[in-house]
Amino acid sequence: MIVLIVSGIALLTLKYASIQSRHYSDSYLKEQAELFLLSSTEAALLAISGYDRQKHNNCLRQINVISPDGRFKVNITAEKYFLFHGKDYNESGEVPWPSSCSDLNESIGRKESHGMVLIKAVVENNSTMLKDNPIRIVRRSLQWP
């Protein structure tokens, strides 16, 4: 009888330990995905700020980033560009906004907010590498490149 009780307690302890281990693993992967999402968003803002819209006659709409280890992929979409009176400016003054991006242009009346971008960033795990725990995090933010 005592052997049954001890084996039952041991079985419950092992089951709890495996559940706890899986929880730590899931939490670690989710934190890694969130950190990669944040760094990818910063990289996208850097790409947007350095992109010459007049030279290319368009604007950046989509930026895709894959983690170096291949575990995660991030899709970043620029949904709106907020421009003072709907016009673009650079060092030499007012420049035309590319006509191919007119659907992304949102005219605003505050010069202080000129150039802000509404970004949607989605991070997902690579389904071939992490099959057990699907991760998908969506973030929308208003950023200033």
Feature annotation, model-predicted:
Residues L11-T13, S21-L35, S39-P145:
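Conserved functional hotspots that engage anionic ligands or polymers and/or phospholipid headgroups
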